[in-house]
Amino acid sequence: SDSWNALECIEHLTLYGDFYLPEIEKSLKKATPYPAAGTFKSGWLGNYFAKSLLPKEKLNKMKTFRDKDPNGLPLDKSVLSRFLQQQKQTLDLLNRARTVNMTQVRVPTTIARWIRINLGDIFRVVIYHNQRHILQAQRVIAHLQKQEA
């Protein structure tokens, strides 16, 4: 089918996490410590990407990259453990990012490795994308519960 089930929504997020979390890690390792990091400033491209992923009342469907499409993959509850582990890793990376200038540190995107946006925007992209698909998974579950009632 065209729509994902709840586990597929979460697996989709782990597939993105598999790309972004190591890239954020690499960028943080290369970054110069910056004690007075100041206020993060969004870039125009990063801001565009992040805002396009924000959950909206009427969700705008987006085409996903084939390698990030979980449709038809054999999935079980280990997907949830992997996702939770990635969430802990994201919190750790966010904490470590306090010591660098998130406006200057650049991270490659899944669109193309040469398209790099700043670290602060990458965090926004990852977090908004997670919110979007967690809400999608919740809607799928709510729909199933209505059908069973």
Task: Locate the predicted segments by residue.
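Short, contiguous alpha-helical
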Residues: 1-49, 53, 88, 95-96, ...
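Acidic/histidine-rich alpha-helical segments that form the ligand environment
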Residues: 46-102
